[in-house]
Amino acid sequence: MANIKSAKKRALQSEKSRKHNASRRTMMRTFIKKVVVAIEAANKEVATAEFVKLQSVLDSYATKGLINKNTAARKKSRLSAKIKAL
């Protein structure tokens, strides 16, 4: 455990952000799963509607640094291609 005051503070901040980011990552995976389930059910309307929401989430997380911007672009590109193939 840290002995220096600033190190203790950083440890607390790190733990807080870890929990916050874990929650956000779970939410992101849920959005992705909704799109994938709609694609597997061949429901283009629902898949498109969920994909619009997902794009917003991925872009905001890429901006905030939760995921890399290229990761966000790759996920959007692959899901978009699957939706277009329906």
From Swiss-Prot:
One of its GO terms (biological process) is translation. Binds directly to 16S ribosomal RNA. Pfam families: Ribosomal_S20p. InterPro entries: Ribosomal_bS20, Ribosomal_bS20_sf. It comes from Psychromonas ingrahamii (strain DSM 17664 / CCUG 51855 / 37). GO terms for cellular component: cytosol; small ribosomal subunit. Belongs to the bacterial ribosomal protein bS20 family. Residues 1-26 are annotated as: Disordered. Keywords: Ribonucleoprotein, Ribosomal protein, RNA-binding, rRNA-binding. The lineage of its organism: Bacteria, Pseudomonadati, Pseudomonadota, Gammaproteobacteria, Alteromonadales. GO terms for molecular function: small ribosomal subunit rRNA binding; structural constituent of ribosome. This is Small ribosomal subunit protein bS20. SUPFAM superfamilies: Ribosomal protein S20 (SSF46992).
